Amino acid sequence: MQVSVFHTPELVPEGTPDCAVAVDVLRATSTIATALANGATAVQVYADLEALGAAAAGYPREDILRGGERGGKQVEGFDFGNSPLYCTSERVAGKRIFMSTTNGTRTLERIRHAPVVLTAALVNVGFVARYIRSQAFETVWVVGSGWQGNFSLEDTVCAGALVEQLGGAANDEAVAAAALFDTWEGDLIELLERASHGQRLLKLGLLDDIVYCAALDTVSALPRQTAAGVLVQGMA
C-alpha cells in the first residue's frame, strides 16, 4: 500500500487512487463523523450554498438539518454551523444533513471520482485506518482541506496519524505528516490551539470545539461516499 498526503485539494495531482480520504479536522470531518455515529442517515455536502438549498428543498423539512459555515461562523438561516458538539443523537438521529463549509466540502468535491471516498478526523482516525488496512488498496491519497488553499497543522497531523497506522509513505508530505504526529501525539489540544484556524476558532469562543476535535478515536464512524457528495456510515 502506497499512502500519499496532499496538504490541500489544490495540490492533488491528476489521476485517481484506489481510495481517497478527505480530512478537515477543524471541523467538517469531525462533524460528519459525529453526526453519522449519532444516527444521521446521511450527510450531503456542497461547496455552494444555493445548490445546498435547492437539494434540501426536495426533502420534507422535518427530515433534514442544514449546516452552513463560512469563516468559522454559522450561516444565517441554517440550523447549525459546523460544530460537532451540535450533533447529538437527540438532534441528528434519523435526519439527513445538508452541509456546506469553508474548506472541507471543496476537498470532497476534488476527490469525489475515486472508487472509494472516506472522511477522517482525529476523532475517528483509528476506525478509518482499520477499514483501509482490511482492503486491498494499492494507492491511498489523504487530502487535507487546509484553509483557503493554505497548509494546516491540524489536517496534517491527522494525515500523519493515518500514515503511522497504514505505513507505506509514498511522498515527502506523508513522511513529514507522520513525523508531526509523532511529535505532537501527546498534546494534540495544544497543537490545534496553535494552528492558525485554531486561533480563529478561539477568537470566536469555540475552545470546546477544539478540545473535542483534538481527541483521538472517540467516535466509531466510517463516513463513506455512496454518491457524489453523499456520505453514510460505512461498514468497518
UniProtKB/Swiss-Prot annotation:
Keyword Hydrolase appears in the UniProt entry: yes
Pfam families to which the protein is assigned, alphabetical: 2-ph_phosp
Keywords: Hydrolase, Magnesium
Cofactor needs: Mg(2+)
GO molecular function: 2-phosphosulfolactate phosphatase activity; magnesium ion binding; sulfopyruvate decarboxylase activity
Listed HAMAP family: ComB
Name the UniProt record assigns to this protein: Probable 2-phosphosulfolactate phosphatase
Species: Gloeobacter violaceus (strain ATCC 29082 / PCC 7421)
Lineage of producing organism: Bacteria, Bacillati, Cyanobacteriota, Cyanophyceae, Gloeobacterales
